[in-house]
C-alpha cells in the first residue's frame, strides 16, 4: 500500500459569543452527504500554515479574518485509507477574529455557514 503525507490549516473563528463553522459537501457529485466543521484546507506550495488558514477561511466563508496568535491552538493528526493509499494528515487550527464583513460568496463545496 502506498503512503503519503498531507498538510492543512484552518481557523477557529470567534465573533462575539459565536464560533464560525461551515457545512461541507462530502462524497461524489450529486451526493447529499455533508458534515459540519471548522473552515480548513490544504496548504499551497511554499505557503505557511497560518497563511493557508487565513486564505481558506476567506475562500470558504467570504469573511476577512486575522490571527489572534501566530501559533496554532490545536493540531489534529489522522490517517485516511483511500483505495490503495494511506494518507497521513496533519491539520493546524488557528484562533481568529473577523475583521471585515462578508466579502464574497463561499466556495461551491460549502453548503451553509
Q: Where on the chain are the PLM-derived regions?
A:
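Nudix hydrolase/Nudix homology domain
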Residues: 28-35, 91, 95-113
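Residue-level detection of beta-strand scaffold positions
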Residues: 11, 40, 53, 57, ...
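Extracellular/periplasmic catalytic domains that process cell-envelope and extracellular macromolecules
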Residues: 13, 86-88, 106
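Active-site segment of metal-dependent pyrophosphate-handling enzymes
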Residues: 62-101
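N-terminal strand-loop-strand
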Residues: 1-38
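Short, charged/polar surface micro-motifs in flexible loops or helix N-caps
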Residues: 14-19, 27, 44-45, 73-78, ...
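The catalytic Nudix box helix
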Residues: 38-73
